[in-house]
Amino acid sequence: MTSIEPTHLGKKVIVGMSGGVDSSVSAYLLMKQGYQVEGLFMKNWEEDDTDEYCAAADDLKDAQAVCDKLGIKLHTVNFASEYWDNVFEYFLAEYKAGRTPNPDIMCNKEIKFKAFLEFADEILDADYIAMGHYVRRRDIDGTSQMLRGIDGNKDQSYFLYTLGHEQVARSLFPVGELEKSEVREIAKEMGLITHDKKDSTGICFIGERKFTDFLQTFLPAQPGNIETSEGEVIGTHQGLMYHTLGQRKGLGIGGLKNSNEDPWYVVEKDLVRNVLIVGQGGNHPRLMSNGLIANQLHWVDRKGPADGSNITVKTRYRQQDVPCRVTYDSDDILRVIFDEPVAAVTPGQSAVFYDGEICLGGGIIDALIRD
């Protein structure tokens, strides 16, 4: 493990302590670098059942234990109202409109790097905030760039593309310089109880519940037909909002007569007729796109790539970068043409653009280009 010499004596950092290993090690590394470190635990969702309450209470307990071990203060704050207004209502509206949003991206934009930063500034007098995200920051020519995390498998820049360079400049990402295995090793060496804690998965307000069960409590079911791409009715669905392009599981249409053994995939959602359209094979022509139109553009450096640039794009998390060419239809509408067709590009999701290691920013996928 590389030692880090103290170089930041006196600068105050508020670390978002989630009760997980990444934020735990982030706090330790910043202390080792000489920062004055305090923790802040966010409550972003008002639980309505015992299981969710226990999960949040356990996370707070773990965060407190880590802070006690490190000898730092832990503050708590409730952002449930801000989360509901700025993240959850957007999430529901997008699903109601037949799109597939990413609430984690909106949470980072509105809560972790806005409400959290404002609270850390105004109440806790912070110089910086820090999170356990796997990204890196690089300061160059008076601006702050966001780079992919060293651990390519854990890189979370896709979820942080809505940050501006001012927010990046106020943020520290210690674990972005490490592999996940190194983070767990450090936590174990330091005797932190989170060293072997399982990484959280899924959307925080859903927890371990089934997604469809959760969504049905807020959006009533709207049953309709499932059709093949040739127009044959082969089943029914409970609501288009429960399905996403490229989905394979949970369709309930296996073992049909007169069909080959290739699995069925969702290839389109017909919102006008409330019909789910499916096709066989992961490379079904109606599942493929040659490009996309993105809007609600956000660039970390405010400028964005030049018109006609050849860069790369991710249309979903953990996807390999896709080489592409970008042109502007307007200041807030970007036309993206892939070098090769891409499967299951999904309206409502984010397209995030890169120039090598640099995360440039991105936008919301509004439409697909298929010719």
Curated annotation (Swiss-Prot):
The keyword rRNA processing does not apply. GO terms for molecular function: ATP binding; tRNA binding; tRNA-uridine 2-sulfurtransferase activity. It is found in: Cytoplasm. Belongs to the MnmA/TRMU family. PANTHER family: MITOCHONDRIAL TRNA-SPECIFIC 2-THIOURIDYLASE 1, TRNA 5-METHYLAMINOMETHYL-2-THIOURIDYLATE -METHYLTRANSFERASE. Its main location: cytoplasm. The active site is at C107 (nucleophile), C204 (cysteine persulfide intermediate). The gene is mnmA. It comes from the Bacteria. Transmembrane segments: none annotated. Residues 102-104 are annotated as: Interaction with target base in tRNA. Pfam families: tRNA_Me_trans, tRNA_Me_trans_C, tRNA_Me_trans_M. Keywords: ATP-binding, Cytoplasm, Disulfide bond, Nucleotide-binding, RNA-binding, Transferase, tRNA processing, tRNA-binding. It catalyses: S-sulfanyl-L-cysteinyl-[protein] + uridine(34) in tRNA + AH2 + ATP = 2-thiouridine(34) in tRNA + L-cysteinyl-[protein] + A + AMP + diphosphate + H(+). The record marks H133, Q349 as: Interaction with tRNA. ATP binds at G16, M17, S18, G19, G20, V21, D22, S23, M42, G132. One of its GO terms (cellular component) is cytoplasm. Disulfide bonds join C107-C204. It comes from Shewanella halifaxensis (strain HAW-EB4). This is tRNA-specific 2-thiouridylase MnmA. Residues 154-156, 316-317 are annotated as: Interaction with tRNA. Its EC number is 2.8.1.13. GO terms for biological process: tRNA wobble position uridine thiolation.
